[in-house]
Amino acid sequence: MARTKQTARKSTGVKAPRKQLATKAARKSAPVSGGVKKPHKFRPGTVALREIRKYQKTTDLLIRKLPFQRLVRDIAMEMKSDIRFQSQAILALQEAAEAYLVGLFEDTNLCAIHARRVTIMTKDLHLARRIRGERF
């Protein structure tokens, strides 16, 4: 289309209402109830950082009590058939196990950071255990 020269026009002082685009008008008048709302997507790492802050604040046990209790009893049954546990003994075992695992994962994370990575791998876990003096 060829360009045309625009001429100046006198203003009447009243602005004419602008026409909305067809898509905007259709979007506003369309009922929302028919569509399914998409769940909110967080950027990668946002949820992970939120979980890290949450678990660093709390002192609760991270492993569920009953599955841990079943595991302890199962291991104990392999050693001796008739053995009983006080609930406080299982709780103490769980506290110690979780403290050990948290410390091990901290050391594993340091090994990954030393290798200039942010993702922990099995080789980091092996290195952390070897440095601690545990055989692997």
From Swiss-Prot:
GO terms for molecular function: DNA binding; protein heterodimerization activity; structural constituent of chromatin. SMART domains: H3 (SM00428). PANTHER family: HISTONE H3 (PTHR11426). CDD domains: HFD_H3. InterPro entries: Histone-fold, Histone_H2A/H2B/H3, Histone_H3/CENP-A. It is found in: Nucleus; Chromosome. Belongs to the histone H3 family. The gene is HHT3. Its main location: nucleus. GO terms for cellular component: nucleosome; nucleus. Keywords: Chromosome, DNA-binding, Nucleosome core, Nucleus. This is Histone H3.3. Macronuclear replacement variant which replaces conventional H3 in a subset of nucleosomes. Nucleosomes wrap and compact DNA into chromatin, limiting DNA accessibility to the cellular machineries which require DNA as a template. Histones thereby play a central role in transcription regulation, DNA repair, DNA replication and chromosomal stability. DNA accessibility is regulated via a complex set of post-translational modifications of histones, also called histone code, and nucleosome remodeling. Functions redundantly to H3.4. Induction: In contrast to major H3, constitutively expressed in both growing and non-growing, starved cells. Pfam families: Histone. Residues 1-41 are annotated as: Disordered. Acetylated. Acetylation occurs almost exclusively in the MAC. The nucleosome is a histone octamer containing two molecules each of H2A, H2B, H3 and H4 assembled in one H3-H4 heterotetramer and two H2A-H2B heterodimers. The octamer wraps approximately 147 bp of DNA.
